[in-house]
Amino acid sequence: MIFQRTVQKMVKATGVGLHSGNKVTLSIMPAPVNTGIVLVRTDMSPAVAIPAKAEQVRETTMCTALVNDEGIRISTIEHLFAALAGLGIDNAVIEVDAPEIPIMDGSASPFVFLLQSAGIKEQSAPKKYLKIKRPVRVEDGDKWAELKPFKGFRVNFKIDFAHPEIARSQQHVVMDFSTSAFVKDISRARTFGFMRDIEYLRANNLALGGSMENAVVLDEYRVLNPDGLRYEDEFVKHKILDAFGDLYVAGHAILGEFTAYKTGHALNNQLVRALLAQQDAWELVSFEKEADAPVSFTVPGGVVFA
């Protein structure tokens, strides 16, 4: 049986909020089977819990934010959720003492490290996968995203930026998902932004914590970060990382092919909502044997399972 996973013990990290610029403390804790991922704002009195569900995503400008019916929000969840998805964590309680998850280095890598430090614990209930039975597609102008049947989880993603540095890099990636491929090839890709946008963002109280410590920054012609890029195709890989996180609010690992052109947080969430609304387009499945599971969540680097 392929079992659900949580973390072995609580872990904490401190960073800054990308948009607020304020210090944020994040704690990740074990949770019982079938809990899913629940985020908790501990700076509220009493603390406010928001389950990570597609319908709770009510803001997708510059990041993905969960917002409850009272308007209480937790923003910038996508990089943390990419790490949870990448390591196959089904159940966790995540406490944060601010309205946003810390940005760390702008990638999912610090969250992968944090989860590996906590240890990964297999639980007593079967892991449920969301299997795509027929294609579901959403469009917005020339942008589109689609999920269709596939035996594992494949990503086929293309971006199209006119910027010379991005245009010179590979802007199209096809990959079959596994935990090891995610950790090695995707998790270190950082968010990126343009100098020309920063003034506007800051005037709107956004990106106040943004810097070359947590983003790839470009002027009109080139990357300004002294150390350059982590991957030659870091731009498209970061968009894939974002999509992994955005799709994980479906509540389960997806079995299917995700194909996207120029998509972002808004369209990713629209796709998840469209999928879940069409109940004949998917089913939840479990696997008796490791060999039968079409997606490998084997953690690289010899992480010990409890």
Curated annotation (Swiss-Prot):
Q: What reactions does this protein catalyze?
A: a UDP-3-O-[(3R)-3-hydroxyacyl]-N-acetyl-alpha-D-glucosamine + H2O = a UDP-3-O-[(3R)-3-hydroxyacyl]-alpha-D-glucosamine + acetate
GO terms under cellular component: membrane
- Which residues act catalytically here? 265
Q: Which pathway does this chain act in? A: Glycolipid biosynthesis; lipid IV(A) biosynthesis; lipid IV(A) from (3R)-3-hydroxytetradecanoyl-[acyl-carrier-protein] and UDP-N-acetyl-alpha-D-glucosamine: step 2/6
What keywords are assigned to this protein?
Hydrolase, Lipid A biosynthesis, Lipid biosynthesis, Lipid metabolism, Metal-binding, Zinc
Its domain of life?
A: Bacteria
Q: Provide the residue positions that the database annotates as binding Zn(2+).
A: 79, 238, 242
Q: Name one GO biological process term.
A: lipid A biosynthetic process
Entry EC no(s): 3.5.1.108
Question: Which prosthetic group or cofactor does it need?
Answer: Zn(2+)
GO molecular function annotations of the record: metal ion binding; UDP-3-O-acyl-N-acetylglucosamine deacetylase activity
**InterPro entries to which the protein is assigned, alphabetical:** Ribosomal_Su5_D2-typ_SF, UDP-acyl_GlcNac_deAcase, UDP-acyl_GlcNac_deAcase_C, UDP-acyl_N-AcGlcN_deAcase_N
Note the HAMAP family from the entry. LpxC
Q: Which family does it belong to?
A: Belongs to the LpxC family.
- According to its UniProt entry, what is the function of this protein? Catalyzes the hydrolysis of UDP-3-O-myristoyl-N-acetylglucosamine to form UDP-3-O-myristoylglucosamine and acetate, the committed step in lipid A biosynthesis.
- In its UniProt entry, what is this protein called? UDP-3-O-acyl-N-acetylglucosamine deacetylase
